[in-house]
UniProtKB/Swiss-Prot annotation:
It is found in: Plastid, Chloroplast. It comes from the Eukaryota. Its main location: plastid. Residues 1-28 form a transit peptide. NCBIfam families: PPR (TIGR00756). Keywords: Chloroplast, Plastid, Repeat, Transit peptide. PANTHER family: EXPRESSED PROTEIN, PENTATRICOPEPTIDE REPEAT-CONTAINING PROTEIN. Belongs to the PPR family. P subfamily. Residues 1-10 have a biased composition (Polar residues). InterPro entries: Pentatricopeptide_rpt, PPR5-like, TPR-like_helical_dom_sf. Pfam families: PPR, PPR_2, PPR_3. One of its GO terms (molecular function) is mRNA binding. It comes from Arabidopsis thaliana (Mouse-ear cress). This is Pentatricopeptide repeat-containing protein At5g48730, chloroplastic.
Length: 508
């Protein structure tokens, strides 16, 4: 790996140059591995929390009288905070509904307040509610005070690109021209993004050539970076090289974002030679230096591939060159150590985060909950699940999948029932991956009635089983020797279309 260091100092395994905060925040955690000792966080006399390693033959949850009092006090506080949060949430919802009601009632009115309409439009653009956003935009154009604004058009076109609506984006582009707006390179870049995000590369290239032939709308590094990212997402690496060559001919030099996009894509594709070559090119640029995104992409590439030693070496070199880690860095380290079964080092990262008061995100909780679930430490997993809720971090579908998988491995069908009851009392948006995890968990426990019941639950929630669903059921029946059921499902598997499931990766 190329050296990144700009100094002769040797970086420690975890950074030590961050100033300790005055306010303490205690997170109790125990790392347990079937082959590793039990690790617990304890507090010393100087109030600096640390992780002490305590070896035990069995996983034990240590609770004394002080812990009970502390827990009761915390539960009262959590209940109070929950009520306050609920009142605030209701207040926000009521304000939004009032705004929506005003917009709906005054359709056709030409005297709405600018702030009311613009805030409503901004809210819908941010939430990617493209149909509603277009409706509000049409209402905006009817107002007496309306004047065409290029910035609003650009935001709408970018939103439509993210929502895979290139035709609508093109319609807005034409309307913008009809209204007399001056089309600049930012508008063209937004439309290029809309085309490329939907895989309409021919249209994107046609627009790129039009930009190159114009005098005042020349493509810039941002335009090329968007195209490069779109091609990398479909693994069209040859097209990426063509774009890089075209950039050089145009006299456009890649920036840090361009290089980071390439490094991240090569890492995900496990093309480590190309990834390192790109990093070397980046280091050769005078005005293009690696940053935390560069470090995180590199660490994720090696850590995700199980190359823990290489990941640690890269971490040291990046840090010795002056690049500070952030919460995403630690999430990557936790995920890599957890999946490789190195709970000792995972605990060291948790200790460091606690010592220097890095606030945990939902990704952090999802990573450690999954790790403890894999290790079979259900008590610690459940403690973290409660803790994230007390910290007002609402569980996601990823969180629930980790819980269901862990309970399935431990044959805790009643616990899975608890997860389902939790879902019924929440507004978590489920996905097909969750239901497939549920099928797998019941299949492992030979709970075939409950496994079939998942299909009914899927239909109730508006989901259709895919090939993964049925293949998981076939596997469970085959292991139990239920050949009749296996034969019945084989025909169903072949008749079902290929799975269209997009697994959301952690936002490291």
């Amino acid at each position: 790996m190329v050296s990144l260091s700009t100094s002769t100092s040797h970086a420690p395994p975890l950074p030590t140059n961050r100033r300790t905060a005055e306010r303490t925040f205690t997170v109790r955690c125990i790392s347990i591995s079937p082959r590793e000792p039990n690790y617990a966080i304890t507090s010393d006399k100087s109030n600096n929390t640390s992780l002490s390693l305590r070896e035990t033959r069995q996983s034990k949850w240590l609770i004394n009288a002080e812990d009970v009092n502390e827990r009761d006090s915390k539960e009262i506080k959590e209940d109070k905070n929950t009520k306050i949060a609920s009142r605030k949430a209701i207040s926000i919802i009521l304000r939004r509904e009032a705004t929506k009601s005003i917009i709906e009632k005054k359709k056709g009115s030409k005297k709405l307040l600018p702030r009311t309409v613009l805030e409503s439009l901004h809210e819908r653009i941010t939430a990617l509610r493209w149909e509603s956003a277009i409706q509000v935009f049409e209402l905006l154009r009817e107002q007496l005070w309306y004047k065409p604004n290029v910035g609003i058009y650009v935001k709408l076109i970018v939103m439509l690109g993210k929502c895979k609506q290139p035709e609508k984006a093109h319609e807005l582009f034409q309307e913008m021209i009809n209204e007399g707006c001056v089309v600049n390179h930012e508008v063209y870049t937004a439309l290029v993004s809309a085309y490329s995000r939907s895989g309409r590369f021919d249209a994107a290239f046609t627009l790129l050539e039009r930009m190159k032939s114009s005098h005042n709308c020349q493509p810039d590094v941002h335009t090329y970076s968007i195209l490069i990212k779109s091609f990398l997402q479909v693994f069209a690496f040859d097209k990426v090289q063509d774009l890089l060559s075209d950039m050089r001919r145009q006299g456009i030099r890649p920036n840090t974002i361009t290089y980071n996009t390439l490094i991240d894509a090569y890492g995900k594709a496990k093309m480590f030679v190309e990834m390192e070559s790109t990093l070397i090119q980046m280091l050769g640029e005078d005005d293009c230096k690696p940053d935390s995104w560069t470090m995180n992409s590199t660490l994720r590439a090696f850590g995700g591939n199980g190359q823990i030693e290489m990941m640690e070496n890269c971490y040291e070199k990046f840090q010795s060159s002056g690049i500070e880690p952030n919460i995403r860095t630690f999430n990557i380290l936790l995920d890599s150590y957890g999946k490789s079964g190195n709970y000792k080092k995972m605990s060291a990262v948790m200790e460091y985060m606690q010592k220097y008061h890095y606030s945990w995100t939902i990704v952090t909780y999802n990573v450690v909950i999954d790790a403890f679930g894999r290790a079979g430490d259900l008590k610690q997993m459940e403690y973290l699940f409660r803790l994230m809720q007390s910290e007002r971090i609402f569980p996601s579908c990823v969180t629930l999948c980790s819980l269901v998988r862990a309970y399935g491995r431990a044959s805790k069908a009643d616990k899975i029932g608890g997860v389902l009851r939790f879902i019924e009392n929440s507004d978590i948006r489920l996905d097909l991956v969750f239901f497939n995890c549920l099928v797998d968990a019941y299949g492992r426990m030979e709970k075939f009635a409950e496994m079939k019941g998942v299909l009914e639950l899927m239909e109730k929630k508006g989901f259709k089983p895919d090939k993964i669903t049925y293949r998981t059921m076939v596997k469970a029946y085959r292991i139990s020797g239920m050949t009749t059921h296996v034969k019945e499902l084989h025909g169903v598997v072949e008749s079902v279309g290929e799975a269209q499931v997009v697994v959301k990766k952690p936002d490291f």
